[in-house]
From Swiss-Prot:
Protein name: Replication factor C large subunit
PANTHER family associated with the record: CHROMOSOME TRANSMISSION FIDELITY FACTOR 18, REPLICATION FACTOR C SUBUNIT 1
Single GO term (MF): ATP binding
Residues binding ATP: G47, P48, P49, G50, V51, G52, K53, T54
Annotated source species: Saccharolobus islandicus (strain M.16.4 / Kamchatka #3) (Sulfolobus islandicus)
Length: 405
């Protein structure tokens, strides 16, 4: 099922509310390009999350019959990724019969200048050589890393969506989706969204689809939930109970634990949640694919991390075929800690004793080098050195046991 903020996104500039100044600036800029005398090669659209930066760029392309060549700059981390956009724009003709192309680089403030070496420089080169107009978006345009980009672009700021336009939009969605929403609940959503239309629509959809109606109690409960990270048990429940991909993905990305530990939690509890053996197989298949993407991401191709999250959340949630039935209801199950964590907890005292021995050995070497190179041989002839190392009774007992195993 498509997310409502995408389903009800304005297609044309005339449908974009509360952004008259930005629309006028963009229209003048794109017309200067179409007339062959661009007043700026690139525009930096900036404003808070959910105000419609990407929507405005897409509406501009629609109204002027331009093919939109879109890339998320914070996901495309390599210089080559940025350069490939220029190559595609320059070499390949449009297959849609449009007048030209519009390049959109989303979330340029999400680029990590330390990890994403060359990305900013790649964008600057793209701006310098481009044959087509470029729009970039950013929540925080004053990030020091974007200083050179600011100097090379036309800055266009967007306003937060006002309460009245947001109310009209939410009421329109409720009517179209046949959702009953109390006025108090609607006011609460509008107030807490603070002009973020995407947040407001997602909250409306999350409650409306789950309960069939939107009340103040439900909205307040969901708002409190969004203000904090989910503990592992809540994360599992939201993933396993999700009927839509975006619900499972939101749960995974809001978890208190990192992706490595989340995979362990999900793996441990798949057989608990799913009764059908085929559902279990499909869930583990998705999780194994997530592990593959995660390993490749750690190898430096961090673009693949998003696929890992999709598979470990949406892929696992979609494993239960019964969810497709209209009368499906989630089953409450008692989840458990990963056995891996339990084993680590039980062995902590043993590992602490071992580490104390290694610290005594590692006088002229690092801990890890001593652990890997010296410690295995030390177990063979440790009795000759126990007095010199001042080993206590507990450490001697550990060595006696370890040397026999």
């Amino acid at each position: 099922m498509i997310q409502w903020f995408l389903k009800y996104r304005p297609r044309s500039l005339k449908d974009v509310e509360n952004q008259d100044g930005a629309k006028k600036e963009l229209q003048e800029w794109i017309e200067s390009w179409l007339n062959g005398k661009p007043n700026a090669k690139a525009v930096l659209l900036h404003g808070p999350p959910g105000v419609g930066k990407t929507t405005l760029a897409e509406a501009l392309a629609h109204d002027y019959n331009l093919e939109l060549l879109e890339m998320n700059a914070s996901d495309s981390r390599k210089l080559q990724d940025i350069k490939s956009v220029a190559e595609k724009a320059s070499v390949y003709g449009s297959i849609f019969g449009t007048r030209g192309k519009l390049i959109l680089l989303d979330e340029v403030d999400g680029i990590n200048v330390r990890e994403d070496t060359g990305a900013i420089q790649g964008i600057l080169e793209l701006i310098e050589k481009t044959k087509y107009p470029i729009i970039m978006t950013a929540n925080d345009p004053w990030n020091p890393a974007l200083r050179e980009l600011r100097n090379k672009t036309k800055m266009v700021g967007l306003n937060k969506l006002g309460k009245y336009p947001l109310r009209r939009l939410l009421k329109k969605i409720c009517q179209a989706e046949k959702i009953i929403c109390d006025d108090e609940a609607l006011n609460y959503i509008i107030d807490t969204s603070e002009g973020d239309a995407r947040y407001a629509i997602n909250m409306l959809q999350g409650i409306g689809e789950g309960y069939g109606k939107v009340t103040l109690d439900l909205v307040e409960a969901m708002a409190r939930r969004k203000e904090r990270e989910l503990d592992p048990f809540e994360t599992l429940r939201d993933i396993f109970w999700a009927r839509y991909a975006w619900q499972a993905k939101n749960a995974a990305t809001s978890a208190q634990i990192d992706y490595d530990m989340l995979i362990r939690w999900i793996s441990e509890n798949i057989p608990i949640q799913y009764d059908n053996i085929e559902d279990v197989w499909r869930a583990f298949d998705a999780l194994s694919r997530a592990s593959i993407f995660l390993k490749r991401a750690k190898g430096g191709d961090w673009d693949l991390l998003s696929y890992a999250y999709d598979l470990m959340s949406s892929g696992v949630a979609a494993a239960e075929i019964e969810k497709k039935k209209p009368n499906w209801k989630p089953k409450w199950k008692k989840y458990q800690f990963p056995s891996y964590i339990q084993l680590l907890s039980k062995s902590k005292d043993i590992r602490d004793t071992r580490d104390e021995i290694i610290k005594k050995l590692a006088i002229h070497s690092s801990f890890n080098k001593t652990l890997n190179d010296t410690y295995p041989f030390f177990l063979i002839f440790y009795k000759k050195y126990d007095k010199r190392l001042s080993l206590n009774t507990k450490e001697k007992e550990y060595l006696n046991s370890a040397s026999k195993s």
